Amino acid sequence: MNRSKKIVALLLTLMMVMMALAGCGNSAPADDNAAANEAGYPMTFDNYGHELTLDKMPEKVITAGPNCTELFIALGLQDKIIGNSCDNHAQAPLDEYKEAYDAIPELTFGYPTLEAVVSSGADFLYAIDWVFEGDFTIENLEANGVKVYSNSASTVDEIFQEIRDIGKIFGVEDRAEAFIASQEDRIDDAMAAVEGMDPVKVFCYDCDTGDGIYTAGGPNIETELIEMAGGDNLFKNLEKAWIGVSLENILEAQPDVIVIHDYDEPVAADKIAAIKADPILSQLQCVQDERFVILPLEDAFPGSRTADAVETLAKGFFPDAF
């Protein structure tokens, strides 16, 4: 009986060792699955009506739009970016982002193309929504294995939700919340400084269309930024985010201030010179009084510069309040 017990015990021991070894062999996938579950994957987002589902954290990101690139840098996610696009017309990254920004490879200078994004090996695209045209669609990109999150915010609440979503996707939710809190504090301070002031009538000068001026309409985040800074966008009732208006309409509206979007080319100084030389716009009292507020183009986009934009606008509208 003793010998039989020893044999049974030996067999049980061998079985336990084999099970342990088998467990070790499967430990990496188990750990991966556990990590994925802890991160909350799979995740589904309502991205402005587009249902985005992610089974795992993206590894290779393309950003289209300087605002999208800067937002990733602000959240410490620059190492995820394998290429960026749409630096045409952009001025420059903020000083605190410049080193990281300059280290990111440029996929395309202008709009990204379907071929360029797919051939890059990217698995995720964060792009300002006006790049989606022709065959460069969310459907075509996702059919080629590239998940897409569209940067389409038209309000401050919406851009903050985008920041929260990006934070959740890449496991940096605490950073996202801290960044939003910092932005909110700065906006609150700027709004407090101009509280009680009579709103100034504002016209946004983006670019000359040849037969008018391209400006910000109602569903444009800049309309809310202007309001936060103590202004009133004279063309907020127009139903498009960006729309051309005639010189006669601008003259009739009689703005108190003109906000000039500063591109790489033409720069703000060239636009101001053109306004002063124009036989219609030069009639405006604000032009004669040189009431111009220069806003970097990137500040007008939904991204990491919400507070920067409100501060710049508020100081331009009410310089004596600061």
Regions found by a protein language model. Name each.
Residues 214-243:
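Alpha-helical, coiled-coil/dimerization segments enriched in small aliphatic residues
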Residues 160-161, 165-168, 174-181, 188, ...:
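Structured C-terminal subdomain patch of bacterial secreted/periplasmic proteins
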